[in-house]
Amino acid sequence: MRKFAYCKVVLATSLVWVLLDMFLLLYFSECNKCEEKKERGLPAGDVLELVQKPHEGPGEMGKPVVIPKEDQEKMKEMFKINQFNLMASEMIAFNRSLPDVRLEGCKTKVYPDSLPTTSVVIVFHNEAWSTLLRTVHSVINRSPRHMIEEIVLVDDASERDFLKRPLESYVKKLKVPVHVIRMEQRSGLIRARLKGAAVSKGQVITFLDAHCECTVGWLEPLLARIKHDRRTVVCPIIDVISDDTFEYMAGSDMTYGGFNWKLNFRWYPVPQREMDRRKGDRTLPVRTPTMAGGLFSIDRDYFQEIGTYDAGMDIWGGENLEISFRIWQCGGTLEIVTCSHVGHVFRKATPYTFPGGTGQIINKNNRRLAEVWMDEFKNFFYIISPGVTKVDYGDISSRVGLRHKLQCKPFSWYLENIYPDSQIPRHYFSLGEIRNVETNQCLDNMARKENEKVGIFNCHGMGGNQVFSYTANKEIRTDDLCLDVSKLNGPVTMLKCHHLKGNQLWEYDPVKLTLQHVNSNQCLDKATEEDSQVPSIRDCTGSRSQQWLLRNVTLPEIF
């Protein structure tokens, strides 16, 4: 009996295990089918394994790449090729994982299903294989498949063999149509982008540089804004990819685009008025006066309507401000979409050379945008950069005609309504040199940067570094920097203008010719013997060394 009972227990236990095995087999078989159905039903870009799963390997999750000491010399030599750490880039996978750097409120936003399609246009010239293909793979892996019409790679006359047939063979295997378009000769970013835009088929054109990495959820918020209003031109937050280590660092949603006196693009803090307009919701787009220009999306038809790029501009430089002014002045809107993040390798120097040099090219381009879009404010720019007035800027009649056709607003409207915190002083007592009566020398910013001392040098009468504005707010400005003194008998430093008076408040007496620093009650004096090129403040004595002539610079002769 015992033996029979024991057999029954063994048999029953075995039966339980058999039934359990069958259940598990059927369960996981069905789960696999469900997963297969789920993956087939989702757009390729929504399967986020390549995006969110941490991988092992150099640079994964955006971590910095550390080069061993024994390879440092080779790394330095390779760095010169593209002006970034090529060795580090080649160690990183094309589909490396990146952190989700979006604001928490962005991660739960829901976008319409019927968003427009986009063609992604990427111009390259002698780009590194690894950075170019990492850009392409990040677009494919992190974008809903049905939203990507195509990727258009425009080769601006590259000389490297691997960017010829090997590139064409590689991109044919990708799951998104990728077209390689060749420029017959070196044409520059502007004309190469125009070529890419001309062959694109998507409802939206998205321009990217050739050394970018898109993050999860980058595309939908851009397309959603254009669907909401086709005259809205949108930029992602541009995250920083280190040129030294390829570390991925989130960009700030608290900065927007502006420009300085020399029409150089600059990032500035988002002003309080824009925060108030968004009611403090940082997930809402920021209206930006200008864009950096490398990364943006625009409705394809609208791009044509507002005049694409100025084809009379050469190579690169100034085109971002020109299109920014045009968008705003001609009825469009320019935004930074804070829920979209795209990384960009920021280089300290360019590896490219340009016929005639970059200075000549940028001067020509800036002259064109000033003549067409800046009205009387162009004269302010010419005083700051008199060399611009000497360049041949070509025929602008078609661009002037475009402005009239589109019935665009004046530049004064742009400054008052879109960029009231512009660095261009609209109300001032003087704009020009500040000359010391005793030494006959002029204040000079010496091309120094923020937190450095203002200088004094022989007056040259050519504007540029010796142009200062004594504003209606009683600031002494040189570009976006104001003369600031923080201690008695101290030197005069240049700090960002804060418009709060304090250490940046100066009182000019046109009779005594003194510039009195109000907070300290001392007067601006000539340089001391200890430091012959740095003025300071001293107790007011009425001496000639404390007398200054504020002279308006006359407009240079314009050709």
From Swiss-Prot:
Effect of C540A: Loss of enzyme activity
Cytoplasmic side, ranges: 1-8
UniProt tissue specificity: Heart, brain, spleen, liver, skeletal muscle and kidney.
InterPro entries: GalNAc-T, Glyco_trans_2-like, Nucleotide-diphossugar_trans, Ricin_B-like_lectins, Ricin_B_lectin
Span list, region Catalytic subdomain B: 285-347
Glycosylation sites: N95, N552
Name of the molecule in the record: Polypeptide N-acetylgalactosaminyltransferase 1
Encoding gene, per UniProt annotation: Galnt1
